[in-house]
Regions:
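Hydrophobic positions on the alpha1 helix immediately C-terminal to the Walker A/P-loop
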Residues: 47
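A glycine- and Lys/Arg-enriched "phosphate-lid" helix/loop adjacent to the NTP-binding pocket
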Residues: 126-198
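Walker A (P-loop) phosphate-binding loop of P-loop NTPases
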Residues: 41
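ATP-dependent small-molecule kinase phosphotransfer cores
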Residues: 58-155
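Hydrophobic anchor at the beta1->P-loop junction of P-loop NTPases
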Residues: 36
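Pre-Walker A (Motif I) flank of P-loop NTPase domains
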Residues: 29-33
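NTP-dependent small-molecule kinase module
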Residues: 2-15, 20, 50-52, 170-238
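Conserved lysine of the Walker
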Residues: 44
Length: 238
């Protein structure tokens, strides 16, 4: 996975569970913002690659990026957050996630959208709700309220479409275990990822217009076709 955004050679203001993005001038935004979500091992990397291939075939400029990370400073925070040897409390983890996100938005995402470039992001705010709000905090309402407050204060643009790749937790973990050494999140127990999955499911039920569940079972090509059909319908692509 590349460390920094990858741009290839072309409207948005999505709502989120009673969350309005932080106030900013987004009138000049012309691009589309799509995020991918899911627990470990659901196939996001492959799915993103194949969506980008579809966009390129359509002549649509796109920028592929990720969270945590996506900008030089955010990538430094990513290294800390994913390092298995990092020992930090939950509040520190949450605030580092938002520090990385603020820089990523200002340095990478917003400039791309203002150029008319489509932004394809591997994880965004929904991962924070699912991982920190449900995985770490067991769905505690106070923690979720804290996360939503941070979104309102610091996230100036939400995705117009979020593709939640849904796969049974144990199946995803089995896939993930075939990869290289596990990072700090991948080392968590099954119960953690069960809560994360529950978080994504709740988010999808609360925001059905923005978050689309994609069945991530079957072949990569089958999943790619489900995603492309959803994107075509959302953005009226022929």
């Amino acid at each position: 996975m590349s460390a920094l955004p990858e741009e290839k050679s072309s409207q948005i203001n999505a709502s989120s569970h009673s969350i309005n993005p932080a106030s900013t001038n987004t009138a000049s935004i012309q691009g589309r913002f799509i995020s991918f979500e899911g627990t470990e091992g659901v196939g996001k990397t492959t799915a993103i690659e194949q969506l980008c291939n579809h966009l390129q075939a359509k002549g649509i400029d796109y920028l592929r990026t990720r969270e945590p990370g996506g900008s030089p400073f955010a990538e430094q925070l990513r290294a800390i957050l994913l390092d298995p040897d990092t020992t930090i409390n939950d509040d520190t983890e949450l605030l580092l996630m938002f520090a990385a996100r603020c820089d990523h938005l200002q340095q990478v995402i917003l400039p791309a959208l203002q150029r008319g470039t489509w932004v394809i992001c591997d994880r965004f705010t929904d991962s924070t709700v699912a991982y920190q709000g449900f995985g770490r905090a067991h769905g505690d309402s106070a923690v979720r309220a804290k996360i939503e407050s941070l979104i309102r204060q610091f996230v100036v643009q939400l995705p117009e479409l979020t593709l939640w790749l849904d796969l049974p937790v144990l199946e995803g973990m089995a896939r993930a275990n075939k990869r290289s050494a596990a990072d700090r999140f991948e080392q968590q127990a099954t119960e953690f990822f069960t809560r994360v999955h529950q978080g994504f499911s709740i988010l999808a039920s609360e925001q059905p217009e923005r978050i689309q569940r994609i069945d991530a079972s079957g072949s990569a090509e089958q999943v790619s076709q489900r995603i492309w059909q959803t994107v075509q319908e959302k953005f009226a692509l022929s």
